[in-house]
């Protein structure tokens, strides 16, 4: 009498997963070719995009901005006013270093601040006119999973502030109270150069890891009734499957955001809504599917 193999179903499942994991992927499909799909069980499909995709997202975001200029630019104006007020308060308190550090760390919390712009992008895609009220008070933003993502980004932001403080404290025993003094120290002394390199590398690494987890997750949680871990996993997969286009997109977001802050936050009035709407386009391109109600 033959003995039944209790592990046969498990082995068959593992064999099927292994065959799927080792299926060939072409470089053409990843970087230069037409838009294709990569599927994984239990997670949404991920589209493979080419290196030109970030520029298409920017162009689409710019068009969307001028389909609803009043609410979108007002949203950007409110952000610029709040950002300027915080920076002014820190500078007036002789904490200019913190103003610089927190401005650089703005990229960590930007995905949650842009939630109203994702809502505007969704409305525009549906053929509706977004209003400032629905952008400021996004109904779906009250969901627990979005709150968890916001808490995660806030903790990352605070972690960045602590790391910046440690790097600065280990680099000098003096307190540079003005921006001019700090810039002079950073650019003209060996300790300042070391601080600049160390802080840039540490901040860049944290920023990129955070970007991988939230670039798709934030708009996805607004659009779909899914869990925060599923959204983060989908975001990481989107970056992994489109590494070079997404690296370019990260550079565009970072450079334009920080350059806007360098104008005294004035450029944020236009740039932030533009990038927020473009980010919605990026999500819809990377995670295709019908809009959720």
PLM feature spans:
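Hydrophobic alpha-helical membrane segments
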Residues: 1-293
């Amino acid at each position: 009498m033959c003995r039944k193999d209790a592990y046969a179903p498990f082995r068959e499942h593992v064999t099927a997963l292994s065959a799927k994991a080792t299926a060939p992927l072409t470089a053409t499909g990843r970087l230069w070719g037409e838009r294709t799909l990569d599927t994984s069980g239990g997670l949404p499909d991920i589209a493979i995009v080419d290196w030109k995709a970030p520029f298409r997202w920017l162009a689409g975001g710019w068009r969307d901005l001028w389909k609803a200029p009043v609410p979108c630019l007002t949203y950007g104006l409110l952000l610029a006013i709040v950002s300027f007020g915080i920076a002014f308060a820190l500078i007036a308190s002789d904490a200019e270093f913190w103003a610089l550090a927190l401005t650089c760390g703005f990229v960590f919390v930007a995905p949650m601040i842009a939630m109203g712009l994702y809502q505007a992008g969704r409305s525009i895609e549906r053929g509706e006119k977004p209003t400032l009220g629905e952008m400021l008070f996004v109904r779906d933003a009250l969901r627990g999973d979005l709150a968890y993502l916001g808490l995660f980004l806030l903790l990352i932001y605070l972690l960045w502030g602590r790391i910046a403080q440690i790097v600065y404290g280990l680099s000098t025993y003096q307190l540079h109270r003005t921006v001019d003094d700090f810039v002079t120290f950073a650019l003209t002394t060996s300790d300042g150069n070391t601080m600049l390199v160390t802080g840039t590398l540490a901040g860049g690494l944290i920023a990129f890891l955070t970007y991988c987890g939230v670039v798709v997750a934030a708009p996805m949680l607004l659009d779909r009734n899914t869990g925060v871990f599923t959204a983060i996993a989908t975001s990481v997969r989107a970056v992994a499957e489109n590494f070079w286009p997404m690296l370019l997109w990260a550079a565009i977001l970072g450079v334009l955001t920080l350059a806007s802050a360098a104008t005294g936050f004035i450029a944020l009035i236009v740039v932030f809504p533009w990038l927020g709407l473009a980010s919605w386009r990026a999500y819809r391109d990377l995670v295709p599917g019908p809009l959720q109600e």
